[in-house]
Amino acid sequence: MQFLDRHLTELAIDEAYEHEHSESPQKSQLNAANLHKYLSKLMYRRRNDFDPLWNQILVAGFDTSSKPFLASVDLRGTTFTSPSLATGFGAMLAQPIMRRYAATEEDAARLTREEAVNVVKECMKVLFYRDARSLDRYSIAVVTKDGVELSEDEQLEKQSWAFAERIRGYGTQTV
């Protein structure tokens, strides 16, 4: 991730320098859609050089026409876009929950900010219960046209381990 951080910082500096010294009134080309395409080419090249970056990256933001953009790129340079995305353990457990609320682009567009944050909080609770090594604290980032709002000290609410008392051994449980 440090390589990507340095590389993207250099890219942003180059972009700002070129934009500052050009006479074109054109807006910056470094938006979410272009960044995603750039990352997919970078990851694909590294894969072909037999030196892959072992990351799954989600890119969120806005494209050139100011439409919301959400896509992923993996270590092979494979790209994917969807109304909701997750990586790692969340791709297996949280993604079905998010699809319940945002199965299509239209469903996702109808979600309010509060509803979307509540869906993410529900997903984080499920992930916390299913991973013994997880913490009950997490961060949430909300991307809007005005910028990124980062809330770093979120904590799971209404935790209840009452269901654990009924679990005996492994396998199918009968009551």
Where are these regions (language model features)?
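Short, flexible loop/turn motifs enriched in small residues
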Residues: 52-54, 65-66
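Short glycine- and Lys/Arg-enriched binding-loop motifs that mark or flank ligand-binding interfaces
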Residues: 57, 73, 84-86
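Hydrophobic beta-strand positions in blades of beta-propellers and related beta-sheet-rich domains
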Residues: 68-72, 140, 148
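Acidic-glycine-rich active-site phosphate/pyrophosphate-binding loop
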Residues: 59-76
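Short beta-strand scaffold segments in enzyme catalytic cores
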Residues: 55-61, 137-143, 149-151
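Conserved short S/T/G-enriched processing/targeting/catalytic segments and their helical context
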Residues: 1-53, 80, 85-119, 128, ...
